[in-house]
């Protein structure tokens, strides 16, 4: 009983210590908290975000998010965190949901977390605005269907080296990124882990610990030949006396051959089946073989260990900066926190509560769309040539019975039956 009380208290302490730096579920006042960027507005290529639950959803109000539109536009919008997030010694959890309702064929669906140092640029927040974290799905055709995890280190952006597959259907999915003070990370989709590992191993933020010695050179006596000619092998006697071609003994002088006019007839030459080509000694394993020479590793003088790769001290904004050929993605339920369990609970209370109803409505809408397409579809085209061939098999015959014109197969008419 005591242990149970302790466990409950521990859970409460953890919950109490967790902090949400940003939480957005997109109600009717969402536009008061978000700033549309002026990026791309002047040239007319900037798109808009509108509040909607889309064509299918679990709850018409709770599932409202912001949707991109129209097609082939750039989209940029941002909002400030409640307070600047210094993640020193804390987990960093970035979570949001996205529904590619339009069956996205090419476009981004990722979120950016932006540092306070970019504050003066947020009015024109766009592709060149420095950010700290970029996370989420990116889809373009069949070649690009990945989850980006890009981290900024000392002013440079580094892409994750792992290939994480993005969800590509038309339903809502929750993407969660966790960065920990021990320099490890997790990526979850729909609260299931799809990737994890080390910031040191899965990004190239630091140079390698060791490098090949640039001053090293291959020793002169280093033998890289895996095989050598057998020094004991000898060329058979008479090998070089065998000609490459010989006269064709089966050839016959043509009957019309005139030696005086055509010259002395000689049979044509053909390849000699006994000829074996240039003699070469057989190859044997080289007893002196040492393998391919590789320069030895040495400590990299440029390597400096950093135990704070995870560390972002001034996270201040979240934003979407996207290009979409086919618009219609709906973003919702954004959370920046320092506690994964709090993020999971938030996802369960939002997406998790309505996902089954959304799927059911999606199936219903798709079924109705398919039925309408089938109903509105034009009849299959008539093969005019085939129809004409069929008609040619018959001829009109007038019968005295008063039944009018009937068609009788040609072959029956031409068979010449006598009337009884």
UniProtKB/Swiss-Prot annotation:
Q: Which GO terms describe its biological process?
A: protein folding
> Biased composition, Basic and acidic residues: where in the chain?
210-220, 357-376
Q: Where in the cell is it found?
A: Endoplasmic reticulum lumen
Identify the residues that bind an alpha-D-glucoside. 110, 112, 131, 138, 321
- Gene Ontology cellular component terms for the protein in this record: endoplasmic reticulum lumen
UniProt motif Prevents secretion from ER: location: 417-420
The UniProt entry annotates sequence repeats at 194-205, 213-224, 230-241, 248-259, 263-273, 277-287, 291-301
Q: What Pfam family is a match for this entry?
A: Calreticulin
Q: Which GO terms describe its molecular function?
A: calcium ion binding; carbohydrate binding; unfolded protein binding
What ranges does the record list as Acidic residues composition bias? Answer: 221-230, 385-398, 411-420
Residue ranges for the region (Disordered) are: 210-272, 357-420
Please give the family membership noted in the entry.
Answer: Belongs to the calreticulin family.
Q: What is known of its domains?
A: Can be divided into a N-terminal globular domain, a proline-rich P-domain forming an elongated arm-like structure and a C-terminal acidic domain. The P-domain binds one molecule of calcium with high affinity, whereas the acidic C-domain binds multiple calcium ions with low affinity.
This protein's name: Calreticulin
Source species of the chain: Chlamydomonas reinhardtii (Chlamydomonas smithii)
